[in-house]
């Protein structure tokens, strides 16, 4: 007759322990939640709200409806920045990530010097984008024209002002971030190294060729790493500022204009409502990229 009481008491004790554990979990999560609300959620909400106002940063914001967005979409610089972003994203998703992934598969074969090469590939990750922009500014600078002198060895009449002539300026700016493909290499290579060796042995026993093993086993198992690389590469193009600001400042004309340059220009002109409207567009484009890439690469599915 006492057994049910013992079971009930045991269950209530376990229930109290679980509630106690949940309290500690919530307590430890509280600082993170507060930081997230104060420094992420609240600023995002403020940006959305003030994008519908006329605000100079000093006086109280005045509601202006859709005026900032109307001015934004009627601005040729904004439309050009969207066009540039589309082509930069296209280059990033294909050439940038594709080349980085290809190099990862080559290094996975462990050729001679592959460890040293992997170490060298860490260099772009520890040098700031501004520093790399200054290096490329020296390479393409019209006073030194390092690249032009090299090309003149083949074509003596070659003379291009890379950062000041269209369409060369666009591709010169593009070259300032293409070398970051080596970071893609490191990310994908890490996933390749984690693939169990048993899968390769089983594939060889089943008669799979090298290409079949790559296509049907390695690439599917690396889709999360490749998808993450695509997301990081595309969102970096949205926020790209240093490479443009230190080289072309969006010129010539608007040929290298970007959303981040428009946003900063709005702040410098004390048009905070307009700048926040640009920020909202950048935020929405980032969400769209995240949703599309996540859907294409099925990153929410388990690899094993």
Regions found by a protein language model. Give the residues of each.
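A structural signal for multi-pass alpha-helical bundles of membrane permease subunits
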Residues: 21-304
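Short, Lys/Arg-rich, polar N-terminal cytosolic tail immediately upstream
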Residues: 1-19
């Amino acid at each position: 007759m006492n057994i049910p009481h013992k079971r009930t008491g045991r269950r209530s004790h376990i229930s109290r322990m679980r509630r106690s554990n949940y309290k500690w979990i919530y307590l430890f999560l509280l600082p993170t939640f507060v930081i997230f609300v104060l420094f992420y959620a609240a600023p995002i909400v403020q940006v959305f709200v003030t994008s519908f106002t006329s605000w100079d940063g000093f006086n109280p914001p005045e509601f202006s409806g859709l005026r900032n967005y109307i001015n934004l979409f009627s601005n040729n610089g904004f439309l050009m920045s969207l066009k540039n972003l589309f082509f930069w994203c296209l280059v990033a998703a294909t050439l940038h990530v594709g080349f980085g992934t290809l190099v990862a598969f080559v290094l996975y074969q462990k050729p001679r010097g592959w460890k040293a090469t992997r170490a060298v590939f860490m260099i772009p990750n520890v040098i700031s984008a501004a520093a790399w922009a200054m290096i490329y500014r020296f390479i393409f600078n019209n006073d030194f024209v390092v690249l032009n002198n090299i090309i003149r060895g083949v074509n003596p009449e070659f003379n291009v002002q890379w950062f000041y002539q269209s369409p060369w300026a666009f591709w010169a700016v593009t070259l300032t971030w293409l070398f970051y493909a080596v970071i893609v290499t490191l990310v994908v290579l890490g996933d390749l190294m984690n693939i169990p060796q048993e899968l390769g042995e089983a594939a060889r026993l089943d008669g799979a060729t090298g290409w079949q093993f790559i296509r049907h086993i390695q690439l599917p198992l690396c889709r999360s790493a490749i998808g993450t690389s695509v997301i990081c590469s595309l969102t970096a193009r949205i926020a790209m500022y240093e490479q443009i600001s230190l080289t072309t400042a969006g010129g010539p004309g608007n040929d290298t204009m970007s959303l981040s340059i428009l946003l900063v220009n709005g702040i410098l002109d004390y048009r905070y409502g307009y700048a926040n409207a640009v920020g909202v567009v950048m935020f929405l484009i980032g969400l769209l990229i995240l949703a599309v890439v996540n859907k294409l690469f099925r990153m929410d599915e388990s690899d094993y």
